[in-house]
Amino acid sequence: MQNAGIAFDSLEQLNAARQLACRLGLPLLTPPLNLGRPTITLVLSAQRLELHHPELGAPLFVDFVKGAMGYRRRQGEGRKQPLARAIGLKGNVCPDVLDATAGLGRDAFVLAMLGCPVRLIEQSPVIGALLEDGLARARKTPETAPIIAQMTLMQANAVDWMGTLNAQDFPDVVYLDPMYPERTKSALVKKEMRLLRILAGKDENAPLLLEVALECARQRVVVKRPRPGVFLAGVKPDFSIESKTTRFDIYLTH
């Protein structure tokens, strides 16, 4: 990735920052740092890994313990929420889920919280590093450790990875959350989503992703879309489940 680098806020983080830079193939930036420059910077501190970008204000990081995800965990949202219904959670049944577009891992965390084993695939090395850091920190916290134990992260191209699966390793459900179509007014696009677009790029392979997902899901493929959005690749689902802003399109495969 051009115009990006790895930084650290103390010498104690130097070795870890150097290893991360080597793994991601990014330059190691040495202090003093000017975080106002036009670059994407991963900053490693003793607390967490953060992503800084001058146009997007506050840094981006993954947190399953506090913040919005901590609130959802404490609220104990049940199986009647739209995501759970879309996945097919009923009774004591917890389907094996493959989240092929993991992103920051929020939906995968909710599904793991509800008892589903979840395999997460993230193609972007930078997003994957942020997610890996968030999982590692949550793994050390007693309240979230059992949930994180249900989650397995892989950094890979989802189409290629699913193509290598043997039939016995097929998931019950493949979950897809491709980038929503970009709105014409940039002010309406959340800064976080704008940054993810920069990192992940356009979902030009989304139609192929759906095609491969339909071939390997034992029970269903679930596609998350904006409520008024078009069907992914123009393929009509068997049915949909809606919330105020989101629509889950369900494609049955059995």
UniProtKB/Swiss-Prot annotation:
The keyword Cytoplasm applies. Its EC number is 2.1.1.242. It comes from the Bacteria. It comes from Nitrosococcus oceani (strain ATCC 19707 / BCRC 17464 / JCM 30415 / NCIMB 11848 / C-107). It catalyses: guanosine(1516) in 16S rRNA + S-adenosyl-L-methionine = N(2)-methylguanosine(1516) in 16S rRNA + S-adenosyl-L-homocysteine + H(+). One of its GO terms (molecular function) is rRNA (guanine-N2-)-methyltransferase activity. It is found in: Cytoplasm. HAMAP family: 16SrRNA_methyltr_J. Gene3D superfamilies: Vaccinia Virus protein VP39 (3.40.50.150). Keywords: Cytoplasm, Methyltransferase, rRNA processing, S-adenosyl-L-methionine, Transferase. S-adenosyl-L-methionine binds at R106, D107, D177. This is Ribosomal RNA small subunit methyltransferase J. InterPro entries: 16SrRNA_methylTrfase_J, SAM-dependent_MTases_sf. GO terms for cellular component: cytoplasm. The gene is rsmJ.
